[in-house]
Amino acid sequence: MTSRLLVFTRTTGYRHDSIPAAVTAVRALSRHPVEHTEDPAALEADLDDCAAVVFLSTSGEVLTPAGRDRLAAYVDGGGGFVGVHAATCTEYDWPYYGDLLGARFDRHPAFQPGRVLLEDGDHPATRHLPEVWEFTDEWYDFRTNPRDTARVLLRADETSYEGGGMGADHPLAWCRAQGEGRVFYTSLGHAAEAYGEPAFREHLRGGLAWAAR
């Protein structure tokens, strides 16, 4: 059976205008056929043929109880999961999901330029990046620091922008194990323009490839 990448973009909270550009980018970057949906029933179906499930700027409560059970079983059993940007603004009422991603969104300052610091360059999502990467985005703060349960790949230099709230240890992208599965998350990707930026595209490509089984 051909593996597919299931890209889910349902929103019941804030909706990012960048979602169409993000989906187009993932189609181009994935080595697997991409199925894009906003139908929660797609997460209730058999996911065993998925190379990975991608929550691409989802927001709010987006899954049914059956979908929650199916996704948890899939990842714990060895499936891949990728969260992009607002994926951490999703499923606040489901404790497992917070554990899955490693952190939950708290707040962000204004969209503005800043510096991304390379913490771990030995990963497909970061091998191409310089030690300091100039980027423009929403610099997400998280309710908790994911470092205790995740391998941090990138962090923010809060001295390079206004309004940061996490201090010197401010993870922006990380990966982790969940059961037998692999999870990759990047908080970057607010604006449509990001998905045409070569360094960000390679960051996303590497994360997708690493998480996919």
Language-model region placement:
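Catalytic beta-strand/loop cores that center a nucleophilic Ser/Cys/Thr
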Residues: 29, 35, 49, 103, ...
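Extracellular ligand-binding/catalytic regions of CAZymes and related secreted enzymes
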Residues: 9, 20, 25-29, 161, ...
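Helical hinge/lid and interdomain linker segments adjacent to catalytic or ligand-binding clefts
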Residues: 6-10, 14-91
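A glycine-rich, often tryptophan-bearing local segment used as a flexible ligand/cofactor-contacting loop or short
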Residues: 61-128
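Extreme N-terminal starter segment of soluble prokaryotic enzymes
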Residues: 2-4
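A structural signal for well-ordered alpha-helical segments within the folded catalytic domains
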Residues: 20, 24, 69, 92-95, ...
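Short, solvent-exposed loop/turn segments at secondary-structure junctions
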Residues: 12-13, 60, 88-90, 157-160, ...
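Oxidoreductase and adenylate-handling cofactor-binding alpha/beta cores
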Residues: 97-103, 135, 140-150, 189, ...
